[in-house]
Amino acid sequence: MIPVVIEQTSRGERSYDIYSRLLKDRIIMLTGPVEDNMANSVIAQLLFLDAQDNTKDIYLYVNTPGGSVSAGLAIVDTMNFIKADVQTIVMGMAASMGTVIASSGTKGKRFMLPNAEYMIHQPMGGTGGGTQQTDMAIAAEHLLKTRHRLEKILAQNAGKTIKQIHKDAERDYWMSAEETLAYGFIDEIMENNELK
């Protein structure tokens, strides 16, 4: 069930679902697994807010375990495509593809709440049962290319070398807010709506 907010206006009462009300304040919620439907909704909101006023920041709140690489990269590409700055605020966690999205916010405007976590790792893939050897080789090559592309984005976002990202992402690499700040994925830690 999605909560409803009722506001008093000069014309009377107006009710909004909570996400529409947040959108009115240029806030987008990116929560749950990254998949095509969620990505399409986030992309549509980014495009709408940019078309409405590209001189005002967009606030993207992130709490996701990650998910689809293609859906996540569609969000990242849109964030980079639009003119409005995108502030990212991580609450809960930004893991896997969520880290790529959250760290792709406008430099200087990437934030994290004090008890949130970041996690990077190499992309996962599979071929399913009954796959021919040739198809398995194609899938493996694609997975390696995808890993390199994600490592390049993460390296740019954190100011690290691709080699360092490759090493750290070999296995699940969890970071606290302080560790994420030191690593370079965020610019500041937010506490009580103020920067730390």
UniProtKB/Swiss-Prot annotation:
SUPFAM superfamilies to which the protein is assigned, alphabetical: ClpP/crotonase
Gene Ontology molecular-function annotations: ATP-dependent peptidase activity; ATPase binding; serine-type endopeptidase activity
Gene Ontology CC terms, in alphabetical order: cytoplasm; endopeptidase Clp complex
Active site feature: 96 (nucleophile), 121
GO biological process terms held by the UniProt record: protein quality control for misfolded or incompletely synthesized proteins
Reaction(s) catalysed by this chain's protein: Hydrolysis of proteins to small peptides in the presence of ATP and magnesium. alpha-casein is the usual test substrate. In the absence of ATP, only oligopeptides shorter than five residues are hydrolyzed (such as succinyl-Leu-Tyr-|-NHMec, and Leu-Tyr-Leu-|-Tyr-Trp, in which cleavage of the -Tyr-|-Leu- and -Tyr-|-Trp bonds also occurs)
InterPro entries: ClpP, ClpP/crotonase-like_dom_sf, ClpP/TepA, ClpP_His_AS, ClpP_Ser_AS
UniProt KW Protease keyword: yes
Subcellular location per the Swiss-Prot or TrEMBL entry: Cytoplasm
Keyword line: Cytoplasm, Hydrolase, Protease, Serine protease
Enzyme Commission number(s) of this protein: 3.4.21.92
Any Pfam family: CLP_protease
Cytoplasm among keywords: yes
Subunit structure: Fourteen ClpP subunits assemble into 2 heptameric rings which stack back to back to give a disk-like structure with a central cavity, resembling the structure of eukaryotic proteasomes.
UniProt function note: Cleaves peptides in various proteins in a process that requires ATP hydrolysis. Has a chymotrypsin-like activity. Plays a major role in the degradation of misfolded proteins.
Family, similarity comment: Belongs to the peptidase S14 family.
HAMAP family named among the record's database cross-references: ClpP
The name this protein goes by in its record: ATP-dependent Clp protease proteolytic subunit
The organism's taxonomic lineage, starting at the top: Bacteria, Bacillati, Bacillota, Bacilli, Lactobacillales
